From Swiss-Prot:
Any one GO biological process: protein transport
UniProt keyword Isomerase, yes or no: no
Complex and partners: Component of the endosomal sorting required for transport complex III (ESCRT-III), composed at least of VPS2, VPS20, VPS24 and VPS32.
Keywords: Coiled coil, Endosome, Protein transport, Transport
Name recorded for this polypeptide: Putative vacuolar protein sorting-associated protein 24 homolog 2
Length: 200
């Protein structure tokens, strides 16, 4: 699957999630609404990475063209530190990591780049900082999609953690509410599954 088709699939799925969030807010199911908003934040970050990866692939192609031109005139391929840097960066991208591994091995064999060393270190931000940033983005998505309805909800309700199923069960009262909660969970899982397939 190409980067372009991946972006198209993610955008289409996000429109479906928008509707699911609005429906969840209407029935006061903030657990599902916030979980779905988190999925949108994750998808948008994936889209951002895909655009960055696309630009880096184009840059690699440019550097390879220069290396090949050098090989024609000098008789050997130039070892480009810039190409190595870009390849190492793309090796971290889950969307195209497998392709880049094979690509980099072939370039190493032909001498286009030196033996690559993939840096496994993530962003300088620690996980706690990233989590806080994601929570802020989730609240923004909820407000943007659900509008005043979500904005008027108590702060404590909007900030509650969404990843504890037992917590959701405790907030539901009566048999009908429990059945509705199960349906919402199934809907959420189905959407998560589709989003995961798009991003993988």
């Amino acid at each position: 699957m190409t980067i372009k088709s991946l972006l198209s699939d993610i955008e289409r799925e996000e429109r479906n999630v928008h509707k699911a969030i609005k429906d969840s807010v209407k029935r006061n199911d903030l657990v599902t609404a916030k979980a779905l908003a988190r999925e949108i934040v994750s998808s948008r970050r994936t889209v951002k990475r895909l655009y960055e990866n696309k630009a880096q692939v184009n840059s690699i192609s440019m550097h390879l063209g220069e290396s090949i031109a050098t090989a024609v005139t000098v008789g050997n391929l130039s070892k480009s530190g810039e190409v190595m840097k870009l390849v190492n960066s793309l090796m971290k991208a889950p969307e195209i990591a497998v392709t880049m591994q094979a690509f980099s091995k072939e370039m190493t064999k032909t001498g286009v780049i030196e033996e690559f060393v993939s840096d496994a270190v993530d962003n300088a931000l620690d996980s706690e900082d990233i989590e806080e940033e994601i929570e802020e983005e989730v609240d923004k998505v909820l407000t943007a999609i659900a509008g005043e309805t979500a904005a008027e909800l108590p702060e404590a309700v909007r900030k509650q953690k969404m990843n504890v199923p037992a917590q959701k069960a405790e907030t539901l009262h009566g048999e009908d509410a429990i059945v509705e909660g199960v349906d919402a969970e199934e809907e959420l899982e189905a959407i998560r599954y589709r989003l995961a397939n798009v991003r993988s």
